[in-house]
């Protein structure tokens, strides 16, 4: 009888000790473990961060870092294999797809800011950029003041769209702002003469130049209107999942792996045209790799 009572006591104690762990378990990690699958959100034309190559394979700087995060998740769950499902997202739908559980993590060219933090979570920063303009070299566009009364394109649902509309209203510049569905469409609008300039993150603008029919026709100009931090989007209020992702990204940055990934996409020829963006690691990026963090600039 005493043995039965003792065994019962051990079982009850074990049950109580397990309860907090279950309560704190990451919903995302549980979903991945139970299904054996993780859904990765990616962009279709955010060169060189996340985009399709000419064989419709997803490639890019951010995509490679996301795969590092997947490896960290696999190790955390002690799984020999995790199936990855790739899902294309746009600037307009990416937040919703993370919120509703369709996408588990999205690493592309998404800015981490305080407004978005009310809707989703963000990983450690993966890139730091400035917002500028792309225009034809002979268009006479040197800075934002030159856009008064002209057609300007940007991509819908981006920080650049918000900044451009705010500038137009506050400075009464009389710009006609065109909001395209993605960066590829934005550049097409510029290329076909429907706009005189394309406002977007500087690295993305260089990416569009890399796939242009004649790259030498285009130039990136203007005073940066903001400094932004790109992060991988996660579901909000899942700190355990964020910790696993952050740990993997931090390891890549502090070990030198991220430097190699950066050099591959920003200092060497890249698909689809084989052009070199020739963007050396900035002081902001050097500081990030030395001391990874998830701070937003606004």
Language model feature labels by segment:
Residues 23-55, 140-141, 145-150, 285-298:
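Immediate post-signal peptide segment of exported/extracytoplasmic ligand-binding proteins
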Residues 25, 31-105:
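Extracytoplasmic small-molecule ligand-binding "clamshell" domains
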Residues 25, 79-96, 139, 177-188, ...:
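Short helix-initiation/N-cap motifs at beta->coil->alpha
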Residues 39, 45-48, 58-75, 111, ...:
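Bilobed "Venus flytrap"/periplasmic-binding protein-like clamshell domains
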Residues 44, 127-138, 210-246, 268-293, ...:
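Periplasmic-binding protein-like
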Residues 64-72, 145, 150-151, 156-158, ...:
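Extended ligand-binding regions for polar small-molecule ligands
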Residues 67, 79-146, 286-296:
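Acidic, polar ligand-binding/catalytic clefts
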Residues 93, 107-118, 163-170, 184, ...:
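A ligand-binding cleft/hinge motif common to bilobed small-molecule-binding domains
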């Amino acid at each position: 009888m005493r043995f039965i009572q003792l065994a019962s006591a051990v079982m009850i104690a074990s049950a109580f000790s397990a309860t907090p762990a279950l309560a704190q378990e990451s919903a995302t990690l549980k979903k991945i473990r139970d299904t054996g699958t993780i859904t990765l959100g990616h962009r279709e034309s955010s060169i060189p961060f996340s985009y399709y190559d000419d064989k419709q394979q997803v490639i890019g700087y951010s995509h490679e870092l996301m795969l590092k995060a997947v490896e960290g998740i696999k190790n955390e769950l002690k799984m020999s294999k995790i199936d990855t499902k790739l899902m294309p997202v746009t600037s307009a739908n990416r937040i919703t797809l993370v919120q509703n559980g369709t996408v588990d993590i999205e690493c592309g060219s998404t800015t981490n800011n305080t407004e978005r933090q009310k809707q989703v979570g963000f990983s450690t920063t993966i890139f730091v950029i400035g917002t500028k303009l792309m225009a034809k070299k002979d268009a006479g566009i040197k800075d934002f003041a030159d856009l008064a009364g002209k057609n300007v394109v940007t991509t819908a649902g981006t920080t650049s769209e918000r900044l451009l509309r705010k500038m137009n209203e506050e400075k009464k510049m009389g710009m006609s702002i065109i909001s395209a569905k993605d960066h590829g469409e934005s550049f097409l609008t510029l290329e076909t003469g429907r706009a005189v300039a394309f406002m977007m993150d500087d690295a993305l603008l260089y990416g569009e130049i890399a796939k242009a029919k004649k790259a030498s026709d285009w130039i990136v100009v203007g005073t940066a209107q903001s400094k932004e931090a790109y992060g991988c989007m996660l579901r909000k209020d899942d700190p355990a999942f964020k910790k696993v992702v952050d740990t993997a990204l931090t390891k890549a940055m502090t070990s030198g792996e991220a430097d190699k990934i950066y050099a591959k996409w920003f200092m060497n020829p890249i698909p689809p045209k084989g052009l070199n963006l020739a963007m050396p690691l900035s002081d902001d990026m050097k500081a990030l790799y030395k001391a990874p963090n998830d701070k937003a600039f606004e």
